[in-house]
Amino acid sequence: MKTIDLVVPCYNEEAGLEHFVLETNKVINSLPEYSFRYILVNDGSKDRTYLIMKKLAKTFNNIKYISFSRNFGKEAAMYAGLRHTTADYVVVMDADLQHPPQLFPQMIQAVEHEGYDCCATKRAEREGESKFRGIFSKLFFKLSNRLTDVKMPYGAMDFRMMSRQMVDSILELSEVQRFSKGIFSWVGFNTKWIAYKTVDRQLGQTTWKFSSLFKYAIEGITSFSVAPLRFTAVMGFIIFVISLIYIIITLIQTLFLGITTPGYVTTLCAILFMGGITEMSIGILGEYIGKIYMEAKDRPIYITKFSNFEDEDNEEKDDKEING
């Protein structure tokens, strides 16, 4: 019997976590030829998410959980879940049912019978999404595909099923500053994309804000590209050429045509323009230096406070001691 692990990052999912498990179980029960296991990762939730995880783990014997000591972010939660997987196939999904488990049969068909290493999803249309957020999302994917070496279709989501080989390859990339969408693409492997229409979450409230999305976009581009650094170098060269041409024109007008140019106007414009370019360049450079600084510390990606994987390990140790 083939096994499938479901990696589910959770942050303040008190309202909908139990409902998510019950709805997902309906799909799992319709696929008796596969053995499913949940790996729920509590990313430092401020509500009762962890207590609900413990309750569910006592009710269903196929539920494992990991609870962080604080909020480390969704990327860390996904990485923690992937590290604890052992199954033939691994699914990464959210707990808000915006990633419908009803797609499992299609995913299984792709990775097991059609020869794909990964079956990923992309957003076809989303009800209730603001136009501003939609425009920002499209701009991000266009910039990312143009500036980085990884290519992602518009609307690409983390929700996907992957082969064991692909998961093991992803785990070899242990950087602290993670951007999983880019990592999924960077490792390669044959991927089938499924487009589906997403809907608003049924229970609870989204924890993603525009500031989080903007930070996520910056992280994605700077994790896989040095194009912003090259951009500042090109801008510097262009400004140098323009300045040189302007100086030559000014000298010709002054020496040969007798035209005098007011100095304060050009000086003020030049100072403001160069000041803006300098600040932008320092900011871009600082972003990359900051990433190097965080990686050089070599801190753990996450810290586990509670986990019932430890109970499993203790049982294995007891069995070994009993069997000699």
Give the ranges of each region predicted by the language model.
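Structured catalytic core of nucleotide-sugar glycosyltransferases
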Residues: 1-129
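Residue-level signature of catalytic and energy-coupling elements of molecular machines
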Residues: 6, 24, 81, 96, ...
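Short conserved micro-motifs on helix faces and helix-strand junctions that flank
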Residues: 9, 68-70, 160, 233, ...
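Residues at helix C-cap/C′ positions in short coil/turn segments immediately following an alpha-helix
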Residues: 32, 114-115, 148, 225-228
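Solvent-exposed polar/charged
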Residues: 58, 83, 109, 145, ...
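Acceptor/aglycone-binding surface of glycosyltransferases and processive sugar-polymer synthases
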Residues: 66-70, 74-84, 89, 101-183, ...
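Hydrophobic helical membrane-anchoring modules
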Residues: 179-324
